[in-house]
Amino acid sequence: MRSILILLLVLCTGLLSAQNRVSVSGYVRDSSSGESIQNASIQLDSGSVSAESNAYGYYSISVPSGQVNLAFNAPGMETKYFVLNLKRDSVVDVYLAPAPRSVGTAVIRGKKGENVRSVDISSQTISSQTIKQIPAFLGEADVIKSVQLLPGVSNVGEGSTGFNVRGGGIDQNLVLMDEAPVFNSAHLFGFFSIFNPDAVKDVQLVKGGIPANYGGRLSSTLDVRMKDGNNQKFQANGGIGTIFSRATIEGPLVKNKASFLVAGRRSYIDVLAKPFLSDDLKGSQFYFYDFTGKMNYRSGRNNFYISTYVGDDAFNAQNAFGVKWGNTTATARWNHVFNKKLFSNFTYYYSRYRYNIGFSSRDAKFTWQSYIINNSAKADFNWFATPKHEIQFGGQSTYYIFKPGVAVATNSTGTNDFSLPDKYGVENAVYVAEEFNPSGRFSYRVGLRVSQFLYMGKGNAYYYKNPAEPGDRRDLESVKKYGSGEVISNYINPEPRFGFKYQTGTQSSIKGGYNRMVQNLHLISNTAASVPFDVWQPTTNNIKPEKADQYTIGFFKNFGANDDFESSIETYYKDMQNQVDYVDGANLLLNEYLEGDLLTGKGRAYGIEFYLRKTTGAFTGWISYTWSKSERIVKGINDDKWYPNRFDRPHNLYVVLNYKLSEKFSVAGNFVLSSGTPTTFYSGQYTVQGYTVPDAGSNARNNVRNPLYHRLDLSVTYTAKKRKRWESSWVFSCYNVYDRKNPFSIYFDTDYQNTGVNAAIRYSVIGNFVPALSYNFKWN
């Protein structure tokens, strides 16, 4: 009886406490453009309660009834204070004004001290302003090149697409554009990304402690949010560069309610090169373009968004040879506020990646096309349950169509079809996560994602014999035909997530995290740098889902008079299962029996990341250093011993600095120093019928490392005096300032001056100093 009375007393106390609290909710927006502000901070004057806006600028905070003081702030914006007398739940939409230019601007977007207070670990957000400050190839600001300067991130060199995170392949990064995935984020074989920086709002990279709402890749999520469009006034901006130009127009359709944005880029390499081409190459083309469009509309508790992207790269050598590749995405989203504490987002997206290759002569022609298409619907919910609890939950279903090869050869005698059969899959997922802050010092996030992948007909399932020796090609044993919609294989995987934060002081904290990730899409490539026509394969009855368990812990510390310096040191260990590799001599192109050439093994990656940045003032930037190892072990390869991944770089040092000399001039520089990537060299050679054949010996893999990679880039920006509604600037940049000939690859060829002797040939993609000049403008 006594226990029941105590329980009733506790419940009554909780109810009385709840009755003395009210909710304040709404959106945080930029007053100059109407753009929503993600991760804005909302703080009660007592400091006992705080909240932040979500990806769509929505917030909800529970406060005591009566008079309260609330402060709203975000980087680069002026803090706004409210004195509210609250008797019931209230809606307060907040518009923050941009801070004056004289005030220091954050390099990487983040609230003061949020890196210490937040439970997030291994996560960085970069604003579009930061991206534009970093010196880049040919003076063009670039999203992916900026991401590659963050700790734990690397790539295999110039001319390579994508990026590598904590020992993962480029296919193990989920790259999202307004929530739609893109499968090749590069233009011009990796020199530029597909993201127009003028249309980008901000970019978030999550490497560890990955929340449960993200899934489908092992290593990271790169979430690129595009601008919604200015709903206050019309404006245009763009630039004229060395090899391409860009333009963006945005403005209100209905002021304060609806807006639009359109942005486009087009290179003119083919136009510039035409006068220097011989007559037989005058018709050649080499260009890329992209188009981004977006509209949004607000109505009461509802926000509607439609966005699209279309982009292509094309190379055509006088119609004798041609290759073309590109992405297309379309996204429709509906935000709905059910009540003050329940926010929802419903999304449908379409994404397609395709490439075409063609050869032709006077009497013959060959074409090859490949596609990966997915349609997806998902629902995400934020429930602001109590001042200390936030619960996220949702689900997603995605339908995939894989067209690995539509190949046709035509000549004077007829037509031959070498096309491969299509493949189909359905990926489903549900998730729930809770973030709990029981005290000011300690908070945690726990979540569970459950994913399912169905490999489906219409199509054939291939079954192979076990090889006589590990590492040998598997011979086909039988084929079974499945009808449309029939399930060939079904995989269900739980994916637990956990993260915590313990604040050791007002300016320091310890954080940790664990996440299991599952991946059902596999990029099959035998090159260190992915090429546009690599093969994407789904999980099948032969290819199992890739899995990774990652453990991360780190110490975060801010210091300086105004917390101007933020620092962190993190260490991680990642264990990977079902990593896909291939037998020696595998045929990866137009091979219907490709799965017989594939092997699976284990992987491991571990390392330490150090990060120091200065966020405000005339002098800003960051320094990061990463020591890491990424290895695999596959039976039948390298004598069944661990060997380095193709993208393993043990040491990576990045220095990014920006100094504002005056209102008109600023200088910036970045320095990169990295270990060389591994490659496979043969240990001997033998002669067959007069031909010299290399012998790797003991099926070695990645047994030699390329030389050190290092590079310095500099830029100077001159900002002209503003004229009414017109702003402009000139950017002079220098890529690879001291003319370093960094090796992209090393191969062997015959030295004709010493007959019969093979010599190592060092190949550099960019082996020279590259200057550039670009002009940027803005009208508003």
For every predicted segment, state its role:
Residues 27-29, 33, 41-45, 73-77, ...:
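Short, acidic, small-residue-rich periplasmic hinge/interaction motif at the N-terminus
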Residues 76-78, 109, 114-173, 177-210, ...:
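Periplasmic N-terminal accessory/gating domains of Gram-negative outer-membrane beta-barrel systems
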Residues 241-268, 279-314, 322-350, 385-389:
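Transmembrane beta-barrel wall of Gram-negative outer-membrane proteins
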Residues 287, 664, 673-692, 709-713, ...:
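C-terminal beta-signal and adjacent terminal beta-strands/loops
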Residues 354, 401-412, 454-477, 502-550, ...:
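Surface-exposed extracellular loop regions of Gram-negative outer-membrane beta-barrel proteins
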Residues 374-378, 419, 427-429, 538-544, ...:
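Outer membrane beta-barrel strand-and-loop segments of large Gram-negative receptors
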Residues 397-507, 637:
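Signature of Gram-negative outer-membrane beta-barrel scaffolds
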Residues 572-575, 594-683, 776:
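Gram-negative outer-membrane beta-barrel transporters
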